[in-house]
Design a protein with these regions (language model features):
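Conserved nucleotide-cofactor-binding alpha/beta core module
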Residues: 2-123
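Conserved histidine-centered catalytic loops in small-molecule metabolism enzymes
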Residues: 119, 125-138
Length: 139
């Protein structure tokens, strides 16, 4: 809901993990681009995509903080990896009026899910909720 995904959107989802989030997003938008640094994990997710008939997800090797500049710009970016602050490389890959949702905060055990919207004058941030340690890994 916080991502406000539309059927014509191009979404970057990081990291791929099991492919669950990318599969859900694939039902809501035009294209999902996802990156995963672990080759075994990525290949397992790609196999799941094929077995489910998901054809609008593109998976590639790579780290979350770099995004996917070759495929940018994106209408939406969803990260399940937390950061102290939003990586500048990802903010640069947002379309105007694009939205990034990411767990942020200096304490890796307690992060706040934050929505960042690219505006004409920069970026607006909205803290949505703070996750306790037991929930953080389940995003």
């Amino acid at each position: 809901k916080a991502l406000e995904v539309g059927e014509r959107h191009r979404v970057l989802q990081l990291p791929t993990g099991t492919g669950y989030q990318a599969t859900l997003l694939s039902r809501l938008c035009r294209w999902v681009y996802t990156r995963e640094p672990d080759r075994v994990v990525r290949r397992a997710a790609e196999k799941r995509f094929r077995s489910l008939g998901v054809r609008n997800v593109v998976a590639h090797a790579g780290e979350a903080e770099g995004g996917w500049p070759e495929q940018a710009p994106f209408d939406r970016i969803l990260l399940s990896t937390g950061f102290d602050d939003a990586p500048a490389a990802l903010l640069e890959q947002l379309q105007p009026d694009g939205v990034l949702v990411v767990p942020l905060g200096p304490d890796p055990l307690v992060r706040s899910v934050t929505r960042i919207t690219r505006t004409g004058g920069g970026f607006e941030r909205e803290q949505l909720l703070t996750l306790p340690p037991a929930v953080l890994g389940a995003i």
